[in-house]
Amino acid sequence: MLTLLSPAKKLLSISKHYSKETSNPLLLDKALQLVKIMKLKSVEQIADLMDLSKQLAELNYERYQNFDLKNNPMNHSYPALFLFQGDVYQGLNANSWKDEEIEYAQSHLGILSGLYGFLRPLDRIQPYRLEMGVNLENPAGKNLYAFWSKIVTNILNQILAEQSNPVLINLASTEYFKVVDEKKLSYPLVTINFYEQKNSELKMIGILAKKARGMMAKYIMQNRIDSIEQIKEFSESGYLFNKEISSPNSLNFIRIH
């Protein structure tokens, strides 16, 4: 099984030091094409592109200007698993993982990325911001979906082909998962959702659903889950699988308040 997450906008200023072997992003050459485009953007253009404040636009302008293309794109880089911070990654809590859990995740967990396309947990990346949904003109079209869709879908098929149970588990946001061409996926896809129930009313609350996605990914990695039936047994933070509102391709969990 391969589990997919979205990245986070918020990054740790100082990532956890990881002394064991790390990896380079599989699609680094493609990512550097986008970096070259972003290096030509002014602070104002970056602010407009991603709807950022001047302060955040200046930060990301500096990030792209300092992005090392010639000598070593891995300079000032950190494993993706430890660099991302945010609701999903609070639930994931990767700093608490054992080394063997991190090693297992390297071939069973993926992070979709606007800049890097697809990341494994130990892929070293430079701090950046580039959401998948932005309309960044590039050689492939008017947005990042045009740039990444075929490439990312192909890499997912390649990784799934190496799995003992080749099922794609989608814990990514709609914005990010749109990059996957579902018609070109060669293997089954299962999406997992989390809902809150109060007074018999079901709601998906963004911040809570994001944290739950991270908790589910942690559960799958730490327990080396390799079947849909095992996923259904997830019960952290009061979430329980609900058969009535689920289907073979959509597993829905409810927490009652």
Swiss-Prot record:
PANTHER family referenced in this protein's UniProt entry, alphabetically: PEROXIDE STRESS RESISTANCE PROTEIN YAAA, PEROXIDE STRESS RESPONSE PROTEIN YAAA
Domain of life of the native organism: Bacteria
Protein family per UniProt: Belongs to the UPF0246 family.
Cellular component GO terms held in the UniProt record: cytosol
GO biological process: response to hydroperoxide
InterPro entries listed in its UniProt record: YaaA
Official protein name in the record: UPF0246 protein lpg1366
